[in-house]
Curated annotation (Swiss-Prot):
This is Protein toll. Keywords: Cell adhesion, Cell membrane, Cytoplasm, Developmental protein, Disulfide bond, Glycoprotein, Immunity, Innate immunity, Leucine-rich repeat, Membrane, NAD, Receptor, Repeat, Signal, Transmembrane, Transmembrane helix. One of its GO terms (cellular component) is plasma membrane. Changing residue 592 to A: In strain: MelZim6. Residues 857-993 form the TIR domain. In early embryos, concentrated in the pseudocleavage furrows that form transiently between nuclei before cellularization and in the cleavage furrows during cellularization (at protein level). Later, found on cells in the mesectoderm, stomodeum, proctodeum, anterior and posterior midguts, splanchnopleura, salivary gland placode and adjacent to the segmentally repeated tracheal placodes (at protein level). During and after germ band shortening, localized in a number of cell types, including the salivary gland, foregut, hindgut, Malpighian tubules and epidermis (at protein level). Changing residue 208 to E: 25% decrease in signaling capacity. Changing residue 513 to R: In strain: MelZim1, MelZim5 and MelZim6. It is found in: Cell membrane; Cytoplasm. The gene is Tl. It comes from the Eukaryota.
Amino acid sequence: MSRLKAASELALLVIILQLLQWPGSEASFGRDACSEMSIDGLCQCAPIMSEYEIICPANAENPTFRLTIQPKDYVQIMCNLTDTTDYQQLPKKLRIGEVDRVQMRRCMLPGHTPIASILDYLGIVSPTTLIFESDNLGMNITRQHLDRLHGLKRFRFTTRRLTHIPANLLTDMRNLSHLELRANIEEMPSHLFDDLENLESIEFGSNKLRQMPRGIFGKMPKLKQLNLWSNQLHNLTKHDFEGATSVLGIDIHDNGIEQLPHDVFAHLTNVTDINLSANLFRSLPQGLFDHNKHLNEVRLMNNRVPLATLPSRLFANQPELQILRLRAELQSLPGDLFEHSTQITNISLGDNLLKTLPATLLEHQVNLLSLDLSNNRLTHLPDSLFAHTTNLTDLRLEDNLLTGISGDIFSNLGNLVTLVMSRNRLRTIDSRAFVSTNGLRHLHLDHNDIDLQQPLLDIMLQTQINSPFGYMHGLLTLNLRNNSIIFVYNDWKNTMLQLRELDLSYNNISSLGYEDLAFLSQNRLHVNMTHNKIRRIALPEDVHLGEGYNNNLVHVDLNDNPLVCDCTILWFIQLVRGVHKPQYSRQFKLRTDRLVCSQPNVLEGTPVRQIEPQTLICPLDFSDDPRERKCPRGCNCHVRTYDKALVINCHSGNLTHVPRLPNLHKNMQLMELHLENNTLLRLPSANTPGYESVTSLHLAGNNLTSIDVDQLPTNLTHLDISWNHLQMLNATVLGFLNRTMKWRSVKLSGNPWMCDCTAKPLLLFTQDNFERIGDRNEMMCVNAEMPTRMVELSTNDICPAEKGVFIALAVVIALTGLLAGFTAALYYKFQTEIKIWLYAHNLLLWFVTEEDLDKDKKFDAFISYSHKDQSFIEDYLVPQLEHGPQKFQLCVHERDWLVGGHIPENIMRSVADSRRTIIVLSQNFIKSEWARLEFRAAHRSALNEGRSRIIVIIYSDIGDVEKLDEELKAYLKMNTYLKWGDPWFWDKLRFALPHRRPVGNIGNGALIKTALKGSTDDKLELIKPSPVTPPLTTPPAEATKNPLVAQLNGVTPHQAIMIANGKNGLTNLYTPNGKSHGNGHINGAFIINTNAKQSDV
């Protein structure tokens, strides 16, 4: 082992010798040096922010050395050594340069080699501070280890395994000014500091010293700070500090000292700061500081045993004393404790057991700025306690047992800035308690039992007076959290113009109005009203912002209150929802994210942000006394402020007549009467008192069989008469409803409506007012073969022509037939003309011409379209048809309808007056209620006449046909149609419209005819391409001999057989003059071959 040790020391010596041969350099370590070291490969260097980190050996998970270098500032060497030979792994040729501080952590002492050799090896130049911290020294420290560290100013040596140090340890460190040794040292050598005449601070804390050698501090004339804390110096005497007259601060806390001699600090004549904390004092001697007239601060904190009191005049006559910190479970203090120490500025007596204070305690503290009496057991303070502390700015009295604040206690504290009296038992505050504290900025009175009420004043008067704080106009913070306050006082709003924070949380405030939130503070004010008992927040609809208003928002937190969500909070709800008057948004910003309703039951737990304003109601009556109630018996009456309505709810009350109703208050605008599910047979007169004010009448589920207009209140705007026994409504009632009802304000379903001619006014009303009738689609006719929805009917459906008309027509036809037979012989030579006349009277339909049938119609075509497709009508369809090669007369509702007429009547009239109806089918048409009604009218007209009169133009993509209206879907599946964009569009459209052509003569006059009825359908058939190949078989039809046709065309009757659809049954040709033709004229009428292509016509 001895040989191994010698070899190690020899190796280190070789390294040192090599190091001593290197030229010195003052260049600081930089990025280039770091890069070169990484290239070398023995160690790894990396820049980290403004530092460099070196790891040796390179890439090791647990490196032996980790160096952190801040050039020109510090070097930290972190060691992980198992033996002193590991120092050989330090990076070679490293030149760190000048640094101020070197710290070596967890490193071993380098054998018998100086620590300075390691610094030299690393190229560290001129350090002034060395910190050596390690619990693994490897050996005891000696003078040799500190050799060549003459330039050090500060040396800190920390270890836990060193109990003794040599007397000459510090002999070579003559320039040392600050020394710190923490090493569990049990004994201090008497000559340890003999050569340290420049030493200014000694830190020997956290050792195990039991005594100090006499005169050990006598050779250090510059010593200022002596820290001997956390040792075992139980028996200090004045001789321990002999020669230490230059010491200014001494710290002997945590030494287990139980008592001190009265003259222990006699030699410390210049001391300014003494720390006696954390000892075991049960008493202190009188005159302890009599020799220390330069005292500035004394600390006696956390005494380990109770120290009941302090000796009289302990801190008296200290001309420079400023700070006292006394926390030792003190129970009482002498009145002359600080006598004539007039420069004291800070006294901390918090966390003691004081119950009261002598009135003269602060008699001479005219310069006192801060006084801490918190966390004691004070129940009372003398009114004269602060009589002389006129410069006091900070007073802390929290966590005591004080019950009141008198009118004089703070009368001389005009400079007080902060007063904290939290967590006491305060109940009363004299109204003049803060008259003189007009400089107060922060007042904390939270967690007390303050209610601020004046017992001799009426409750209403108390809301109009100021609180005791009204004199503090410059107050910034007023903390009244967790008290018993029930009002927001006027002075908080109107006179505290600098207020920034008002905490009223956890109090007993039960209601708020606009005036309670109208703060005039010129700062951004935060008001905390959470956890009160606020049930009502009433804001007016309109407010006037006076001259005192400023633009600063008041932030009010209203969360966690038991709010009653009734009609009184309407404008508050509007403000929360953002639907508010502008003046509110400029004044308040409310926090309500946790505010929910506590009542009524239906809204319990609902966040106010989700409340709908129309659900907010209040009872009309607040008394249960029948003599005082205005609400009808068996009914519930509420006021709804949202629309200023009185709601009377008498539903399911087994009523047989409308009860007597209260008169509508002048502030109310509406009366809503609910009488659903009763047994009413009739309604009262509209002039009945109370009933005359009803604006919304709900009568569903009664037994009404009729309603007269004089039973409907004049101002009625909503009427629900569904599920009664009504069969009809007369025209006067419908006229009234037409004048007064609003959107979806009428309900008529569930009644057994009779859909006959008497129901025509009702049907027209439902068609004209489909937006007003909320249940229009559920109105059913009961007199049909099966229940039919009224919305699907037209006036022609419910009111067909009189039977008498048909009887008269039959009689006329019969008479006409008799007359024709009677005169047949007389007018034999005119038999052709007579047959034509009979044919014109529906006796010979194949000779009936279209123009003859439609000669009384004003228009060639009625155009049905959605108003959203109007550009197509105006820009294309109308110009092409009215001004094209064949000019047609069109009916367009924008131009040709009668002004003021019913829409359904205009539709029926337009269809009846037009030879064709053109349907411009699009998505807009499908969505249009009126457009679908126009189609339905045209379709039914065509069905009644047995003729095809509808031309469908598909203008745009209509989607899935299966999703269309049933009637329209069926029509499109069974009939042909045109598509906009077809190359033959205009030719096909003009061909499908009525034709007028000049033709031959009959008899003595010219007879102009259009195609036969059969050809009308054939023209429409040409809208879609015809099959290329004709059908292989002729459709079955009833063959009819037409002698008239035969005679007119020069053939025998049996040669001219016509099929009912207008086709020639023999050859599909007609042969005038013995020639066969595919098309031609018969009797002056143009006949079209229905199997011909369009190009053949």
